[in-house]
From Swiss-Prot:
GO annotation, cellular component aspect: cytosol
Subunit structure: Homohexamer.
Name this polypeptide is given: RNA-binding protein Hfq
Function, as annotated: RNA chaperone that binds small regulatory RNA (sRNAs) and mRNAs to facilitate mRNA translational regulation in response to envelope stress, environmental stress and changes in metabolite concentrations. Also binds with high specificity to tRNAs.
GO MF annotation: an example: RNA binding
Length: 82
């Protein structure tokens, strides 16, 4: 059985590991710019200017990283012929 691939967790984890500057857009329209420090099923911690903010995921609209991140490992991609 193939393990499921959670794109949200993988995307956030890559942003965290690569310390990519990211703009977090909230549903209210407010923007938070910083680096993802941690996340779980319900929250994301963003560090900006030496301060940490805990943001509830239900309040987030969009993550906009300053650059693209790798979304898969080349060895992990399954190739099918046909």
């Amino acid at each position: 059985m193939k393990a499921s691939y959670n794109i949200q967790d993988h995307f956030l984890n890559q942003l965290r590991k690569e310390m990519v500057p990211t703009t977090v857009f909230l549903v209210s329209g407010f923007q938070i710019r910083g680096v993802i420090k941690s996340f779980d099923n319900f929250t994301v911690i963003v560090e900006s200017e030496g301060r940490q903010q805990l943001i509830y995921k239900h309040a987030i609209s969009t993550f906009s990283p300053a650059r693209n991140v790798t979304l898969y490992e080349p060895d992990a991609v399954e190739v099918t012929e046909g």
